[in-house]
């Protein structure tokens, strides 16, 4: 059986990267929450 996680740097950046987060309202909210919490790394 194939494992579910097949790492790809491109897919990772495109779905969870900073620009991907900034492109949607929900993504902007995610970043805002992470900044408010004080996360050192807000995106991948």
From Swiss-Prot:
The keyword Aminoacyl-tRNA synthetase does not apply. InterPro entries: Ribosomal_bL34 (IPR000271), Ribosomal_bL34_CS (IPR020939). One of its GO terms (biological process) is translation. GO terms for molecular function: structural constituent of ribosome. Keywords: Ribonucleoprotein, Ribosomal protein. One of its GO terms (cellular component) is ribosome. Belongs to the bacterial ribosomal protein bL34 family. This is Large ribosomal subunit protein bL34. The lineage of its organism: Bacteria, Bacillati, Mycoplasmatota, Mollicutes, Acholeplasmatales.
């Amino acid at each position: 059986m194939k494992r579910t996680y097949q790492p790809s740097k491109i897919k990772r950046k495109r779905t969870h990267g900073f620009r991907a987060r900034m492109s949607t309202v929900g993504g902007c909210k995610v970043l805002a929450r992470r900044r408010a919490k004080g996360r050192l790394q807000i995106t991948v």
